[in-house]
Amino acid sequence: MNKLNWYDFTVGYLIQAHYDIVKATLIINIDVPRTLEHPRHKEATCFEETFANVNLIFKEVRYLKNIVSANMTSDPNEDAGDTEYIICAPASDELLKELGFGDKKIRLDYGDGTNVSLSWRKEPLMYTKFETAETIFHIVFRELNIVETADKLKKI
């Protein structure tokens, strides 16, 4: 998790996101600059060379809510994927209860009168809120891997 401070999420750009429901895995691909804390920050000779293509790989996703602005698909512009921030912390019992996790059941209300309950086991979970100019991800998961997709510095 400490790798999150290696990147400046206020300046990055969302490239794509893919959710595999069977594997319960979410991959968010972003182009984001490295910070001074990154071990390779000294390799860059200008700001553009600080950017890296990064995959945020959320494993064992238990909850995913993605809010997408109509502008993302109907009138996208060059700023649509601008990243604004990311927070990541242990998911508190209060948050889990608010999201429908409680008493070993996950309660889902589909809004049309349909209610579903699924069994779950109490486990240590993490929560992330990741926001761009046109979309917000709320994710409850067990493990996060942060992987740069190229060995050398990416030039824009």
Which residues does each PLM region occupy?
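Surface-exposed, interaction-prone regions used to assemble/regulate multi-protein complexes
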Residues: 1-156
